[in-house]
Design a protein with these regions (language model features):
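Generic preference for well-ordered secondary structure
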Residues: 3, 14, 22, 63-66, ...
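N-terminal first-folded block
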Residues: 3-40
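Short, well-ordered beta-strand segments in beta-rich or mixed alpha/beta enzyme
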Residues: 4-11, 50-86
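Residue-level signal for secondary-structure boundary sites
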Residues: 17, 77-79, 114
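Short amphipathic alpha-helices in soluble, non-transmembrane regions
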Residues: 20-26, 82-89
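Bulky hydrophobic/aromatic packing residues
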Residues: 24, 42-44, 70-73
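Glycine-rich beta-strand-turn "strand-cap" elements at beta-sheet edges
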Residues: 31, 35-62, 91-115
Length: 115
């Protein structure tokens, strides 16, 4: 069953187009290494919660929009191999990110329902 690596970040709203281009480049890179697809979603209807929400989780500023994305892999072993290749590839360190990557969070997820 496919394995998912999900990401949440806060992106300056003014950088939407730069982020879209960055995501396209990253998606091509992930796919070259073994991912099957990348999905990037720009926050459109994201409510603020009393206890927690996308804004609090990323320490968003007033001029930032939450982004939710995921990379799909054929399996966890492929995801692990891709992450290893990425950690060894110095070209990724030079990729300019149009957001504060320190406030991004991510994790790997095993699918339990896929309909």
């Amino acid at each position: 069953m496919p394995y998912i690596e999900g990401f949440v970040a806060a992106v300056p709203t003014a950088n939407k187009e730069a982020y879209r281009k960055h995501a396209q480049e990253a998606g091509a890179y992930f796919k070259k290494l073994g991912a099957t697809r990348l999905v990037e979603c720009w926050g459109d209807d994201v409510p603020k919660g009393a206890l927690t929400d996308f804004y609090k989780a990323t320490q968003s500023k007033d001029d930032e929009t939450p982004v939710f994305s995921w990379v799909e892999y054929p399996d966890k072993a492929t995801r692990d191999a891709v992450n290893k290749k990425m950690s060894e590839d110095t070209s990724m360190a030079n990729m300019e990110m149009p957001f504060d990557g320190k406030r991004m969070f991510w994790g790997g997820f095993e699918q339990i329902v896929n309909e």
